């Protein structure tokens, strides 16, 4: 029995792949398994993705789009918190996203702005450190806000 509506196989495959990614990691994703789960022929996913790498690229692109939505319209401090929140909620996708080039819309947010680049680097690094357990016991959003406040204080004091 098929688990998708006609004409919606690509989004169904991406949803299933995203679930596998977060539960089992990217190594567990295969087009054949996704076809089986969707109840379609093993060749059907190839109408939407040339190969496994194309599927992973689509997952990463979708992740960047979701991240952009999470950041949109927020002041920079809230963007920093939203960035960390996104990474913590989607650790496997977050890691996958940064195995590829950052898309132009996100790259342009920091391009040519040294403070924005430094803030992104700091927040991205904090996200990875939190994910790897280096700030165990600390509330992530409070950590981000405190770190940003300390950096702003240091800038004013310099």
Outline where the language-model segments fall:
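Short, hydrophobic secondary-structure boundary micro-motifs
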Residues: 30, 95-98, 138-139
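Helix-turn-helix
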Residues: 12, 16, 20-54, 58
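Amphipathic alpha-helical linker/stalk segments
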Residues: 61-79, 102
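Helical hydrophobic small-molecule/effector-binding pocket
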Residues: 77-100, 120
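Short hydrophobic clusters on alpha-helical segments that form packing/core surfaces
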Residues: 13-21, 63, 67, 83
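Alpha-helical DNA-contacting segments of helix-turn-helix folds
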Residues: 21, 55-63, 97-101
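Hydrophobic/aromatic-rich alpha-helical bundle segments in the mid-to-C-terminal region
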Residues: 103-151, 155-158
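N-terminal intrinsically disordered/low-complexity leader segments
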Residues: 1-8, 19, 158
């Amino acid at each position: 029995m098929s688990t998708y509506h006609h004409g919606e196989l690509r989004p169904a495959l991406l949803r299933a792949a995203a679930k596998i990614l977060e539960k089992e990691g990217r190594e567990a994703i295969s087009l054949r398994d996704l076809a089986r789960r969707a109840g379609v022929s093993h060749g059907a996913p190839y109408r939407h993705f040339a190969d496994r790498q194309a599927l992973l690229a689509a997952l990463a692109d979708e992740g960047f789009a979701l991240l952009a939505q999470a950041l949109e319209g927020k002041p920079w401090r809230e963007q920093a918190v939203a960035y960390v929140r996104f990474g913590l909620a989607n650790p496997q996708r977050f890691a996958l996203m940064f195995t590829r080039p950052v898309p132009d819309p996100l790259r342009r947010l920091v391009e040519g702005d040294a403070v924005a680049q430094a803030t992104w680097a700091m927040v991205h690094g904090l996200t990875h450190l939190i994910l790897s357990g280096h700030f165990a016991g600390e509330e992530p959003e409070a950590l981000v806000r405190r770190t940003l406040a300390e950096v702003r204080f240091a800038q004013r004091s310099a």
